[in-house]
Swiss-Prot record:
UniProt family annotation: Belongs to the DNA mismatch repair MutS family. MutS2 subfamily.
Organism (species): Thermotoga neapolitana (strain ATCC 49049 / DSM 4359 / NBRC 107923 / NS-E)
Gene: mutS2
Pfam families noted in UniProt: MSSS, MutS_V, Smr
Protein's name in the database: Endonuclease MutS2
Assigned EC number: 3.1.-.-, 3.6.4.-
Length: 757
């Protein structure tokens, strides 16, 4: 029996498939099934989720499904030009993805996808031999270039002769034109005049008035053209075979890359699904605890989060209550989330959720009925339960929905209790739903079982779909009947038919529900107040930081004015020292020292104020005692990587001070003596006209800084910007050479330029 299907596992996988970027990922997701060791998959998904949150989308351009090309390769056929382009684009995408992931901080992703094999030589060869429009390039071989050159010359000669023929034989032609059919130039000759032309008749018009003839003088020319076309076809076939053989000789590596990209696509879809639905990665634990768990198949605007915990000293939860109250969804979610976690999927829940590994997950859900086998509801359930009981052990998670239903309530309850006892003796973990009172009582008195119910609003006579732990559910039949208008005497008659014990139990359950509902409501109010308090606290902290920054800026301004004043006074005192008497000179010197000490104390106080703030990625900083302002690009432990424009330096955090706003502005404007020059520029999105002064300035900077090589990032797009850049570089005498980048440099989206230095 496929218990995963009963738990809606395939439907959730289909939801995740929507986030793949190729069919490779879809097929990989279909292979995922629960395993007792899902750690590696979960860690990979977690790292990729962190990647998406911090860096955005990974580079996946060109990573399409090349399975059809692989099948053709294995069959021994040569790939067509457009197929080779697809494979080349895929392999270039593999290189780009590998380079991106290996330079990030995610260890598992690095280890896994550093195994992608580079096909740099093949990619270069395809780029050389095949144009982007799918035509084999003249660069592919000298022979192909020569054949095409001959074809062009011969075509020019034939067309000239054909034009002359039309001009000189206009009286015998039906129209003043010629046609090219099946590799031959033909002329529409009037049928009555066909004997006046020596040549071969190829076609006759439907009316019979025109014959399409190949004059004798064109036969040899056409034969030569056909021969050149055949030579061209053979040479192209040879080139395509050569490129295909490059792949065939590395077929295992190609298959490995396809498998790795399928895996990455699958991980990407799972991480994307989590990111868009506020999901998290839950690692295996020794407990079962759901915190705001949301069933993926229920729309966001309708789903009610589930909170449920199985204490360590319990082996099962018995959930009771009215129909349509959410019991089935609750137990299904426990089984589904366990299966998803064990298969390497993220879960839609909050931090604090814990789930155990179960080698066996078995379920019988009420809505699954063997109608095709013509079995009754009870027989349908019992058939599955027999199989579950037979296979259950201490490694089993068992989900049973509406246990004991579909038959006489007394016998059904007795059978349900016996089944629960047997499963507990075997050590299985149980999540059971029922509406039978004897089962509720049994659960209340059993040390390994926990009672739970679905909350019911007596005012609206509708379920809230929230789980209440520790109290069994009531049927609420009398309340609902009374609310809907059933006469009171009938309801009282019904009550009188209940035994004293049943009435007391129902009253006790109702009282417990009311008390727990009130407590839950109070708990929700407190939680809401706590959240509002945390928001206010965050706001006040932010306001305090803003106010503090303003005060520091005011202090900096005052300090600057004081420094200016001290410099002015010092200058006047220095001038006075030269003309004053010795006693006066000594006194003046003391005054200067006092003023300088005050200035240093004020500066020290300002620096200490700066140091109190935490340094993060993106902050502008300067080294202690220095004036150069840099930008923090990475923080690891107690060390930061700081970009000072002309170089990057690792500096202990204790040696860094946050720059003032004015210093940041100065850095951006370039007024500090810190070079902001880079060996690359990004002109994507510019027109050729907008890019021209930027490119020329870049060449100036390369030459002035004595740097031989630079990188111009223009993107691939239509190629218009790249063409414009090359035209600018071609006219600049300082440029020694330029070319497109290698795959690792950015491919055709980057131009690498070398200048004289």
């Amino acid at each position: 029996m496929d218990y995963l299907e009963v738990l809606d596992f395939p439907k959730v996988v289909d939801l995740v498939k929507r986030h793949t970027f190729s069919d490779l990922g879809k097929r990989h997701l279909d292979t995922l099934k629960p395993t007792v060791n899902p750690w590696n998959e979960l860690e990979l998904v977690e790292e990729l989720l962190n990647y998406l949150t911090r860096w955005g989308e990974p580079p996946i351009k060109g990573l399409s499904d090349i399975t059809p090309e692989m099948e053709k390769l294995k069959a021994g056929s040569s790939l067509e030009p457009w197929e080779l382009l697809r494979v080349s684009s895929f392999l270039e995408g593999c290189d780009i993805l590998k380079n991106d992931l290996t330079r990030r901080e995610y260890q598992k992703l690095k280890e896994t996808f550093s195994q992608l094999v580079s096909f740099e030589e093949f990619v270069k060869e395809v780029n050389r031999c095949i144009e982007q429009n799918g035509e084999v390039s003249n660069r592919a071989s000298p022979k192909l270039k020569e054949i095409r050159s001959e074809k062009r010359s011969l075509s020019t000669e034939i067309k000239k002769r054909a034009d002359d023929f039309v001009k000189n034989h206009s009286q015998i032609l039906q129209e003043q034109m010629y046609v090219y059919r099946d590799g031959r130039y033909l002329f529409p000759v009037k049928a009555s005049m066909k004997r006046s032309v020596r040549g071969i008749v190829h076609h006759l018009s439907s009316s019979g008035a025109t014959v399409f003839m190949e004059p004798e003088e064109f036969v040899e020319l056409n034969n030569r053209m056909r021969l050149l076309e055949e030579e061209e076809r053979l040479e192209i076939s040879r080139i395509l075979r050569h490129l295909t053989n490059m792949l065939l000789s590395n077929l295992k590596d190609l298959e490995k890359n396809i498998d790795l990209i399928a895996h990455f696509d699958s991980l990407y879809a799972r991480a994307k699904f989590a990111k868009e639905n506020n999901g998290i990665v839950v690692k295996p634990s020794s407990r079962i605890k759901l915190v705001n768990a949301r069933h993926p198949l229920i729309p966001k605007d309708r789903v009610v989060p589930i909170n449920l915990e199985l204490p360590p000293n319990k082996k099962g939860v018995i959930i009771t209550g009215p129909n349509m109250g959410g019991k089935t969804v609750t137990v299904k979610t426990v089984g589904l989330f366990t299966a998803l976690m064990m298969s390497g999927f993220p879960l839609l829940c909050d931090e604090g959720t814990e789930l155990k590994i179960f080698p066996k997950i078995m379920a019988d859900i009420g809505e699954e009925q063997s109608i095709e086998q013509s079995l009754s509801t009870f027989s349908s359930h019992m058939k599955r339960i027999v199989e579950i009981v037979r296979n259950a052990d201490s490694d089993s998670l068992v989900i049973l929905d509406e246990l004991g239903s579909g038959t006489d309530p007394v016998e059904g309850a007795a059978l349900a209790i016996a089944i629960i006892e047997d499963l507990l003796e075997k050590g299985a973990t149980l999540f059971v739903t029922t509406h039978l009172t004897p089962v509720k009582v049994f659960a209340m008195n059993h040390p390994l079982l926990l009672n739970a119910s679905m909350e019911f609003d007596p005012e609206t006579l509708s379920p809230t779909y929230r789980v209440l732990v520790g109290v069994p559910g009531g049927s609420h039949a009398f309340q609902i009947a009374e609310k809907l208008g059933l006469e009171k005497r009938i309801i009282e008659n019904a009550r009188s038919r209940l035994s004293q014990e049943e009435m007391e139990l129902e009253g006790l359950i109702r009282s417990l529900h009311e008390k727990i509902s009130l407590l839950e409501e109070e708990k929700r109010k407190l939680q809401k107040e706590k959240e509002e308090y945390m928001k206010l606290r965050a706001k006040y902290e932010e306001d305090y930081k803003k106010l503090r920054r303003m005060k520091i800026e005011e202090f900096d301004k005052e300090l600057k004015e004081l420094n200016d004043y001290i410099r002015k006074v010092k200058k006047e005192l220095d001038q006075a020292i030269h003309v004053a008497k010795s006693g006066s000179v000594e006194e003046m010197r003391k005054t200067v020292k006092t003023l300088e000490k005050e200035r240093e104390d004020l500066k020290k106080k300002a620096i200490e104020e700066e140091a109190e703030e935490e340094i993060n990625v993106g902050d502008h900083v300067r080294m202690e005692g220095g004036t150069s302002v840099g930008k923090v690009v990475e923080v690891k432990g107690n060390t930061a990587l700081v970009d000072f424009g002309f170089l990057r330096v690792k500096v202990p955090l204790g040696k860094l001070k946050k720059a003032k706003k004015k210093e940041e502005e100065d850095r951006e404007k370039g007024t500090h003596f810190v070079s902001s020059f880079r060996t690359e520029i990004d002109i994507r999105g510019m027109t050729v006209e907008e890019a021209e002064p930027v490119v020329k300035k870049f060449i100036d900077d390369l030459v002035m800084n004595g740097i031989k090589k630079g990188y111009i990032i223009h993107g691939k797009g239509t190629g218009k910007l790249a063409t414009g850049v090359w035209e600018i570089l071609r006219k600049d005498r300082r440029v020694v050479s330029f070319r497109f980048g290698t795959p690792s440099e950015g491919g055709t989206g980057v131009t690498v330029v070398e200048v004289e230095v």
